[in-house]
Amino acid sequence: MKKIVLVGYMASGKTEIGKLLSKKVNLPFLDIDYLIEESLSKTVNEIFEEKGEVFFRKKEHEVFKNKINSKQSFILSLGGGTPCYAENHLFLQKDDVISIYLKGSVATLVDRLKMNKDKRPLLKNLANDELAEFVAKHLFDRNFYYSHCKYTIIIDDKSPFDIVEEIHKILF
């Protein structure tokens, strides 16, 4: 049984890499945001707007805990904040979990986030010139939680295919 959990900040490529890895290793790919949306029949943006972040984080924890304690094999992409709440970071160190932090520099992440920040509840009200400071602060605050991953892969200047190859080497 393989439980591969991809961790990283917004726009680190978790979803794209998860989908590519899924095809390569023949495991189902799951995205925690999609699982939450499916369980509530609402988008993440709608959940944030209607119920607030605290409600969202509680639901996120419940979904993550249920999935990680299941007997299934999968590749799971977490939200950027998932490890930082409700002691979710402790699940990253379970014996049957392979947790991988996709680590990007502030510059890389800001470049990627500028393209679709309207789809990100935490960013949609920020001006582009505020993004770098916001991302840098978040990365600093979240480093403790992200560092609980068993593996770290630097994503700067690498294609998704190169990153998938690095992960494949870890797995096999």
Curated annotation (Swiss-Prot):
Positions contributing to substrate binding: D33, R57, G80, R142
EC supergroup of this enzyme: transferase
Positions bound to Mg(2+): T15
UniProt-annotated location(s): Cytoplasm
Principal cellular location given in the protein's record: cytoplasm
Record's keyword terms, sorted: Amino-acid biosynthesis, Aromatic amino acid biosynthesis, ATP-binding, Cytoplasm, Kinase, Magnesium, Metal-binding, Nucleotide-binding, Transferase
BP GO terms, sorted: amino acid biosynthetic process; aromatic amino acid family biosynthetic process; chorismate biosynthetic process
Name of one Pfam family that matches: SKI
Functional pathway: Metabolic intermediate biosynthesis; chorismate biosynthesis; chorismate from D-erythrose 4-phosphate and phosphoenolpyruvate: step 5/7
Lineage: superkingdom: Bacteria
Annotated InterPro entries: P-loop_NTPase (IPR027417), Shikimate/glucono_kinase (IPR031322), Shikimate_kinase/TSH1 (IPR000623)
Residues where ATP binds: A11, S12, G13, K14, T15, E16, R120
UniProt GO cellular component terms: cytosol
A single MF term (Gene Ontology): magnesium ion binding
Cofactor note as given: Binds 1 Mg(2+) ion per subunit.
Cofactor: Mg(2+)
Catalysed reactions listed for this entry: shikimate + ATP = 3-phosphoshikimate + ADP + H(+)
Enzyme Commission number, as recorded: 2.7.1.71
Classification via PANTHER family: SHIKIMATE KINASE (PTHR21087), SHIKIMATE KINASE 1, CHLOROPLASTIC (PTHR21087:SF16)
Role according to the record: Catalyzes the specific phosphorylation of the 3-hydroxyl group of shikimic acid using ATP as a cosubstrate.
Family: Belongs to the shikimate kinase family.
Subunit structure: Monomer.
Name listed for the protein in its UniProt record: Shikimate kinase
Organism: Flavobacterium psychrophilum (strain ATCC 49511 / DSM 21280 / CIP 103535 / JIP02/86)
